[in-house]
Amino acid sequence: MCLARNVLEIGTLGGYSTIWLARAVGPSGQVITLEFDPTHADVARANIERAELADRVDIRVGAALDSLPLIAKEELGPFDLVFIDADKENNTEYVRWALALSHPGTVIIVDNVVRGGGHVSNPDIDDERVKASRAVLEMIAAEPKLDGTAIQTVGSKGWDGFAVAVVNE
């Protein structure tokens, strides 16, 4: 795929995606994952240790919008892949940071943006998460540095999907 070795994950929860990402980057790769909730970070840390991948994962606890400037200052980018699965209301800011910490070819994935199928395309729906998902999709479409699309998923959890974009310059 994109042969990512340096990955940024925004939103860790229990570390399920983190474990898959850490396996994918291989022994020489690194995943930096940002989690707001210390309890979730502890659960993720335990799961990552159980998976014997702790040497590939750096868990940072706190608000992602506070952690991202520190990551930039520490020059830990550019990242090959940025996976965003956190508070939907800040997705546009997370994509801005993903762009700032990227290089041409970086893949940016924003999870859970389809929001029940037709909800995102319905301007009469006033739910904050739906409005945030709509905003990030519009941002990706308008950003000249990104080529992206939304992909719908349907399964036992219902109708949702994700946006995937590639940095082109």
Kindly give the residue locations of the regions a language model identified.
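S-adenosylmethionine/decaboxylated-SAM
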Residues: 1-169
